[in-house]
Each structure stands twice: as C-alpha cells, then as structure tokens.
C-alpha cells in the first residue's frame, strides 16, 4: 500500500501522529488547503523569475500533469475536486477516453482523472539545480561543505559551529529539509518536524512511453518521463532518517509501475529521499519565535 511504518520508529512518531489527528477536522483541512494554495500559486512565477537567468533548453516541459484513479476511492476524489474548484485551481475532469488520448500507453486501469494543463515537469532536476548553483556563485555567493553541529550566539549574532571551525553571521537561514530539526532542537525551538521517506526507481530508455507525469492516486505513486528514463516515485514511509532503505518498498514501486504500464525492463537507481513533514502539512517559513536573526525555510 501507499503508507508504511518502520515499527522501531513508531514510538518516536506518537506525538506527531496525535498532532496530525487534531488537524484532520474539516476546518483544519480547509485551513491547510487555502494556505498551501496561496504558497503554490506563487511557485511557478518564482521559478520563472529565476529561470530567466539560466539556459533551460530541454530541461523543463510544459505538458501538464495527469491524476488518475479507479472507482474504489471515488468519494475522496470528488471531495478533492470540490475543494480545488472552491480555491480556483485550473483543473479539467477527464473521462477514460480523454485519459487514453493523453497517454495511450497506460493500461486501462482507470475510471476517471483530473488534468492540470498548466503543470510542468523537470526532465533532469540535477542539471537545473547545478545551473542555479552556478548562478549563485556568479552573483557572489560562496559554498562551504561541512557538518554544522551547533548554533551559538555572540550577543544576538548567530555562530555556526562545525567540527573544527566557527562562523559568525548577522543572520542565518536554516533550510535543511528534514535534517533541520537537528539544529532547531539545539535552539530550544520545538518544531514537530519529521520525515516522510519516499522511494524512487528508474526504468532506463522508457521515457517515450509517457508525455507528462501521471499519478495513480489509489496506490499513491507517480511516473514521470525524464532524461534518465521513467522515474517512478511514491509511498509514504514513516521511519526517520537513520533506518535503511526497505527493499519491500522498492518491490512495491516496481509492481505498481508494471500495473500501470505493463512490461518494463529491469529497473535501475534505487534510492530513498526524505521529505520534511509537519502534522498540519504546512511549511515553516519565516523568522524564529525565539531568535530574531534566525529564519526558517
């Protein structure tokens, strides 16, 4: 299934789960949806502003994103469509025939879907990131790779401490994703941050089989055509940052990909990513409540 637990990590997740349950009311869910919509509505214009300064030829495609499902979870899908309509999201409900016309290589496992025609996808995120990194250096940015172990203060100025060096700054931004908690805990800022472990595999030289990202909502996974082939991603696994990769989760992705696409070659590039997650599913963006010169992102 799309959700998995590492049982040795469950005791540590109990406070997070209790907070999550408190955020499952209709009122709290709508609060999250409205605020996330406001944030995501700014995402593409913000990317466009950055992309004006780098050459993205062939790295980003504007072919939309397709969500599909079968009848098993139709009630949930209708609620999602209703909420997005209320928020003004540009979405097109599509029939099985329209899904086939968009993506003829998908097996007929679906009964309906939604097409987001303005969606985009990256053909190679690493290449895009390296181009942005080069732009950062060109504009005078400096990059130091080291293990930051603690944050102290000189009056109000934050001091970053590594194993054998210290750096004093006027202001700092903590933007370490799921790993940020190691630093925020040292600041006595009890942010209920944890991680959703997501799995990835590639099927090399198969990107021609799809034109755009396709997400099968019943099983909680998606497939995106990329330079490396078809990237299959999905599942939410609660297990922290230290547990090893689960081969069962990889097998689950392989089976799901073949369930959607039929015969595929041997997969490549098994890897695990750590998505930061909070109980209300809203990000932490802005100044620290306790330290005015520290910002979170």
Where do the language-model regions lie?
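Dinucleotide-binding Rossmann-like beta1-alpha1 core, especially the glycine-rich loop
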Residues: 1-96
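Short beta-strand to alpha-helix junction loop
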Residues: 31-44, 66-76, 101-102, 115-134, ...
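A short coil-to-beta-strand element that immediately follows conserved catalytic motifs
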Residues: 60-62, 145, 193-196, 261-273
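Helical element adjacent to the flavin cofactor pocket in flavoenzyme catalytic cores
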Residues: 75-87, 99, 106-171
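C-terminal catalytic lobe of FAD-dependent flavoproteins
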Residues: 91, 217-218, 258-297
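Flavin (primarily FAD) cofactor-binding/catalytic cores of flavoenzymes
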Residues: 112-119, 123-134, 148-149, 164, ...
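Central helical "cap/lid" subdomain
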Residues: 153, 160-211, 263
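Conserved FAD/dinucleotide-binding core of flavoprotein oxidoreductases
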Residues: 226-261
């Amino acid at each position: 299934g799309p959700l998995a637990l590492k049982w040795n990590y469950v005791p540590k997740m109990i406070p997070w789960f209790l907070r999550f349950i408190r955020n499952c009311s209709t009122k709290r869910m709508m609060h999250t949806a409205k605020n996330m919509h406001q944030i995501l509505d700014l995402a593409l214009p913000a990317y466009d502003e950055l992309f004006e300064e780098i050459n993205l030829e062939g790295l980003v495609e504007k072919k939309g994103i397709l969500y599909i499902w079968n009848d098993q979870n139709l009630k949930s899908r209708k609620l999602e469509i209703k909420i997005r309509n209320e928020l003004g999201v540009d979405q097109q409900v599509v029939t099985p025939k329209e899904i086939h016309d968009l993506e003829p290589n998908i097996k007929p496992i679906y009964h309906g879907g939604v097409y987001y025609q303005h969606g985009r996808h990256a053909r190679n995120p690493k290449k895009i990131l390296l181009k942005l990194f080069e732009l950062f250096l060109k504009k005078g940015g400096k990059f130091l790779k080291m293990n930051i172990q603690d944050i102290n203060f000189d009056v109000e100025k934050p001091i970053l401490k590594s194993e054998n060096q210290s750096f004093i700054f006027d202001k700092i931004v903590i933007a370490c994703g799921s790993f940020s908690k190691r630093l925020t805990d040292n600041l006595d800022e009890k942010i209920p941050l944890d991680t959703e472990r997501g799995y990835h595999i590639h099927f090399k030289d198969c990107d021609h089989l799809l034109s755009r990202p396709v997400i099968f909502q019943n099983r909680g996974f998606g497939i995106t055509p990329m330079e490396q082939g078809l990237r299959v991603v999905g599942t939410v696994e609660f297990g922290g940052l230290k547990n090893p990769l689960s081969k069962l989760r990889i097998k689950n992705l392989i089976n799901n990909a073949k369930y959607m696409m039929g015969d595929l070659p041997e997969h490549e590039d098994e890897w695990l990513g750590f998505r930061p997650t909070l109980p209300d599913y809203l990000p932490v963006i802005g100044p620290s409540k306790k330290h005015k010169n520290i910002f979170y992102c």
